[in-house]
Amino acid sequence: MARIAGINIPDQKHSVIALTAIYGIGKTRSKAVLAEAGIAESVKISELSEEQIDLLREGVAKYTVEGDLRREVSMNIKRLMDLGCYRGIRHRRSLPLRGQRTKTNARTRKGPRKPIKR
């Protein structure tokens, strides 16, 4: 298995799909990295040479991925919560942020129903 950005990339998948195993790399970014490295999208990871894998490592290293990206996202959310802005308050209360209704629905974000005590 090839190891890129600290992640074991699946060998038997096409290179476009295999690169999406890295957090922060989707199909579009995967295609861009492959085009920059000059590797065909249909080639499987197991068929790549060590030099080509090194090119992929360099291409992926240009982006914020994996732990750094997760940390950046969590710090952004923490910043919103510390500011006390509307979005930060909604994060703190575990409610939807983007204007969805909450009288009904929003069960995923709010969690299971709480029984009414009489």
Curated annotation (Swiss-Prot):
Q: Which residues form a coiled coil?
A: none
GO molecular function list:
rRNA binding; structural constituent of ribosome; tRNA binding
Q: Which GO terms describe its biological process?
A: translation
Recorded family membership: Belongs to the universal ribosomal protein uS13 family.
Write out the function statement from the record. Located at the top of the head of the 30S subunit, it contacts several helices of the 16S rRNA. In the 70S ribosome it contacts the 23S rRNA (bridge B1a) and protein L5 of the 50S subunit (bridge B1b), connecting the 2 subunits; these bridges are implicated in subunit movement. Contacts the tRNAs in the A and P-sites.
Subunit info here reads:
Part of the 30S ribosomal subunit. Forms a loose heterodimer with protein S19. Forms two bridges to the 50S subunit in the 70S ribosome.
What protein name applies here?
Small ribosomal subunit protein uS13
Q: Which organism is it from?
A: Photobacterium profundum (strain SS9)
Phylogenetic lineage:
Bacteria, Pseudomonadati, Pseudomonadota, Gammaproteobacteria, Vibrionales
